Amino acid sequence: LLIACDTEVQQLCKTLPFNLSYVKSLCVHYESPTAEAMTKKISGITGFKGLTSPTKKVEGGYIPDFNSRYFTADFSYGLVILIQIAEYVNIDVPNMRETLQWYHDLVGERKEYNFKDYGINTYQDFVDFYSL
């Protein structure tokens, strides 16, 4: 799913009228064209050793801490923004949508970033804002 979402990000980058050539595919960055290769590569990176998913202790064990920045920023801002950009350029991003739906199914609807809150209502508004 990560690689599929990364492919969708790369498709978005190619569609936008900005120089986004520096946005590398994860597969290129980690030199890993498959999920298996990516898993092996990432699990072997020393800097990632000891990193855990945010959890909180409950009776009988641990559960994900959906109030941590990891979840609130990455989903409610990062993924939501990418999906909104895809809507502006009419690109289907089913893997991003599936991931966001999974998150919503777990935590319910939450306040999320919306371009319209900042006066960005159209594709042209988006381009103008980021061309400043």
Annotate each predicted stretch with a short phrase:
Residues 2-132:
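NAD(P)-dependent Rossmann-like dehydrogenase/reductase catalytic/cofactor-binding core
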